[in-house]
Amino acid sequence: MRPGTALQAVLLAVLLVGLRAATGRLLSASDLDLRGGQPVCRGGTQRPCYKVIYFHDTSRRLNFEEAKEACRRDGGQLVSIESEDEQKLIEKFIENLLPSDGDFWIGLRRREEKQSNSTACQDLYAWTDGSISQFRNWYVDEPSCGSEVCVVMYHQPSAPAGIGGPYMFQWNDDRCNMKNNFICKYSDEKPAVPSREAEGEETELTTPVLPEETQEEDAKKTFKESREAALNLAYILIPSIPLLLLLVVTTVVCWVWICRKRKREQPDPSTKKQHTIWPSPHQGNSPDLEVYNVIRKQSEADLAETRPDLKNISFRVCSGEATPDDMSCDYDNMAVNPSESGFVTLVSVESGFVTNDIYEFSPDQMGRSKESGWVENEIYGY
């Protein structure tokens, strides 16, 4: 894996952990506090009183044991409905909340006893607050028994009616680990009923949204959660800034190094032109090149034929006093004495060929040619 990919994976994992920590704190059942809600009592003060706990967010709803523990810590118990009038009263409480779909736990639960032939399944259900009331509001085909031990009050406004009529506010046995809303009841007598905690069951709760809470409290809570999320995100991003800068600098350095390496590997487009010894004959009719061309032709002819006797090839130097009309400046092949003025020796007796460079005439050059046996071929001023 490349270092850049690994760094991105680590940053993503840290960011996800920080966001999860910012969304909510994991609570146990003992952390749930219902004292912020106002109980509803008959006539305002008469006992028993009730609290209808409804969660707008379905992920915050509680299972049966969690709901029972929350009511107990608030000084109550899961509701026991002892008469039809009390059933109607609780239905009105729920209707005033205008909640959406979501069943409510009530304090009815089946005892963990083996069912005998003489004992019906529904006779095994009892109230968790110790009430001995035999009032029941089961739906037509309930209870179904089996693995469904705890009891809920149906609240599914969007559900169509079943074979036994509407489901609304009817009772149904359900699995105790299901997440639902619940109703607490506060009576004059508060019998100490030991709570049965579900063994080996992990509880993850968040602070519930009670129906009695005002919009201002909700806004404050939302603002607090948003601020905590922003702080957690800042704590994650600020330490990661040096790593991001290091990654950017490393990327830029690698890019510059690769560009320079590619530039060095590319061939140089400029090529040097190779000049031939002899200039091109099509360069023009410059008077300065006529002497050069004549010597070249004479050299080629001289090399092509066999010469039994070598002789010096000279040309007459045009005098500066002669005019163009009476000076032909023709080239003559003749053997002369090197000491004579007006001639420049081009070829020595020992070389046997004509070279392609012309010295300017001077007595010093004449003496050098006589001693070395040949004349160096360079053209001055060309």
From Swiss-Prot:
Gene Ontology cellular component? cell surface; focal adhesion; membrane; ruffle
Q: Which residue intervals make up region (2 X 4 AA repeats of N-X-I-Y)?
A: 356-380
User: Which sequence ranges are marked TM in the entry?
Assistant: 236-256
- What subcellular locations does the record give? Membrane
Region Disordered: list its residue ranges: 266-285
Q: How does it sit in the membrane?
A: Single-pass type I membrane protein
CDD domains referenced in this protein's UniProt entry, alphabetically: CLECT_chondrolectin_like (cd03595)
Signal peptide location: 1-21
Q: Which parts of the sequence are annotated with region: 3 X 5 AA repeats of E-S-G-X-V? A: 340-375
Which GO molecular function entries does the Swiss-Prot or TrEMBL record give? Answer: carbohydrate binding; hyaluronic acid binding
Region Interaction with TLN1, as annotated, extends over: 337-382
Q: Which residues lie on this side of the membrane: Cytoplasmic?
A: 257-382
The residue spans the entry assigns to the Extracellular side of the membrane are as follows: 22-235
Q: Which residues are glycosylated?
A: N117
Q: Show the disulfide pairing.
A: C71-C184, C150-C176
Residues bearing Phosphoserine? S286, S299
Q: Where is the C-type lectin domain?
A: 45-185
Ranges for the region named Interaction with NF2 are 330-374
| Quaternary organization | Interacts with NF2, RDX and TLN1.
Protein name per Swiss-Prot or TrEMBL: Layilin
Query: Which gene name belongs to this protein?
Result: LAYN
